C-alpha cells in the first residue's frame, strides 16, 4: 500500500513538473521578459555599462550588506552544477542551437530581474537588528495588500531553497568527492554540515561575506579553464558559432531539431538564471544600496543574470563544443559529458579541478539558498526560536542529502520552484507600474547628471513604504527642523 502511494505521488510530481517546466513556465516567463523589455525601453542594453559600474562601485565598505556582497550572494545561488551539467544536457537534447535560445532568454530575463529586484528594494523593511529584509513575499503584502499570497510564496520558497535544493547540492558534493578521491560520504556530510552551520548561524551578513570570498574565486577559476580551452581551439570558434545559429533557426540538422533546440535552451536559461522566480529578489532587498535608490539593485541583479548565463553557461558550452566530444557517440550526458570534454582537452587532472569547482559551486549555493529561505521564515514569523529550529532542519536536510539519493526530492523542489515563479510573475505584473515609475525617476536623475536618490515623498501613490528608509537625508532634516519649530 505504501509503495503504491509513493509511486502515485512520484507520478503526480513528475507530471506536474513536466507540465510546469515543459510548457507553462516557458510561455509565462518569456512573455514577462518581452513585456518588461519593451516597457523599459530595452534598458538591459541601453544601460548595461551603467549596471557594470554599479556592481564595481558596490565593493565599497559600508555599514550593512553592500551591493557587491548581494551580487555575489545571488550569484552563489544562481551558479551551480546546473551551469555545468544543465548546459551539457541542453546540448545533448536540443543540439548546439539550444545555446542560442539560452542567450536570448537571458537577455529578456535581465529586464524581469530588474523589475523584481527594484520592487524588493522599494518594499523592504528593517528588522529589530537593523537588517534589511524583503523580497516577493514582502511586496505582495505591502504593495498588493495580499499577505496570503506572500505566505504561499514563502512556503514554496522554503520548501525548494531551504530544504530540497540544499539536500541535492550536498548530495552532488559528496558524490564528487567520493568519485574523485574515494572519501566516505558520511564524513564529508558532517564536514559540510559543520561548515554550513558556522556561516548560516551568523545570519545574512556572514552569508554575504562568505559569498563575497567564494564566488569570485570559483567564477575566475572556471572561466580561466574555459578560456584555456577556447584559446587552444580558437580556429574552431567561427564554425561553432555558425553551428549554434544555424541549428537554432533550423538551417542545419540539430539533435532535437529547431523546436527541440528552442525548448531545451529556453528551459535551461530560465532554470539557471532564475529571472522571474523571485528568489534573487530576497537577497536584493537586503542590500544597503549605493547609490541610495531602489533601481540601483535592479541594475546589479540584471548584470547577475548576464554573468550567470551569457558568461558562465557559455563557458560550459564552449568546453563541450570545442572539445570534439559531440562528433561521435560516447554514451555520456550531463556532468559526464563535460568531464569527458575536459579530459580530452586538458588531461586526467581536470577530474580534480571539476571536483573542486563542484564543491565551491554547491557549497556557495547552500549558504545562499539558506539566506533566501531565512528572509521568508522571518516574513512568516518574527520568532527567533522558530529561526533556530529552521536552521537545525536545514542542516539536517544537508546531512540527509549527503548520504541519500534524492531524485524524488529534486523533482518536488522543481515543482515548488515552478509554482513559486507563477505566483511571483503575477505579483510583479500587478506592481509593474510602481517599478516603471521608480526606474523612470532613476533614469531622469541620471540624465540630469546627479547621483540618483530616492525620495519617497515624490511617490504618494506608493503605499506602505517603511517609514524613514526611503526619505532622502535632506528631506528628513527638513522634517525634523519643522517638527522642532
Identify what each model region corresponds to.
Residues 1-81, 91-98, 399, 429-457, ...:
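N-terminal alpha-helical transmembrane segments of multi-pass membrane transport
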Residues 17-50, 92-130, 307-315, 351, ...:
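Extracellular loop-to-transmembrane helix junctions
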Residues 25, 40-44, 82-87, 162-174, ...:
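Transmembrane helix-loop junctions in multi-pass membrane proteins
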Residues 28-35, 39-52, 171-177, 183-233, ...:
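Membrane-interface loop-to-helix entry segments
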Residues 32-37, 108-130, 136-200, 356-366:
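Helix-loop-helix module between adjacent transmembrane segments
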Residues 42-67, 89-91, 95-99, 111-144, ...:
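Flexible loop linkers connecting adjacent transmembrane helices
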Residues 61-93, 119-137, 141, 258-306:
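Alpha-helical membrane segments and immediately flanking helix-loop junctions
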Residues 115-124, 225-243, 256, 285-291, ...:
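Extracellular/periplasmic helix-exit of transmembrane alpha-helices
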